[in-house]
């Protein structure tokens, strides 16, 4: 039985342009005065480079906390990018999706977690690594609603 990848298409909604303040924020809030507005920023245009090849998926677990990816984070994944060593990728391992850092050591390719409590995933002869895409961004929510 051949498995077909599950598709997670980018959201097909019109961009919403929000104000981008030029004032840098250390521990306060910028004045809402128009003098500080640098321009307008659309998050989908900022986060998505290739609309037709981008999908979203939620992170599960804490194997990537060292890379700033936490349980429940929304990952922006571009499947048009060719993964290179050091990229964070979505891969299929033994039929399950995982997010890990793709690494190359000599001729060996492996997936590295960013949490010392987890082991590297090494591939033996005959095992296939299927990369679904490169993680380009994360979206974090601090207030659940």
Locate the predicted segments by residue:
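Short, compositionally biased
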Residues: 85-99, 103-109
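Short, solvent-exposed secondary-structure boundary/capping segments
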Residues: 31-32, 109-114
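Charged, well-structured alpha/beta interaction segments
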Residues: 66-67, 75
